[in-house]
């Protein structure tokens, strides 16, 4: 897992090692 790469997870996005929850509307 690279911190520079944005990984799309279930209900959130992994960016720079931080999991930010982004609700799908």
Swiss-Prot record:
One of its GO terms (biological process) is regulation of smooth muscle contraction. InterPro entries: Neuromedin-U_amidation-site, NMU_C. PROSITE patterns: NMU. GO terms for molecular function: hormone activity. Keywords: Amidation, Hormone, Secreted. Its main location: secreted. It is found in: Secreted. It comes from the Eukaryota. The modification Asparagine amide is found at residue 25. GO terms for cellular component: extracellular region. The keyword Transmembrane does not apply. Belongs to the NmU family. Stimulates uterine smooth muscle contraction and causes selective vasoconstriction. This is Neuromedin-U-25. It comes from Rana temporaria.
């Amino acid at each position: 897992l690279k911190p520079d790469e944005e990984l799309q997870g279930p209900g959130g996005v992994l960016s720079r090692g931080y999991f930010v929850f982004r609700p799908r509307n």
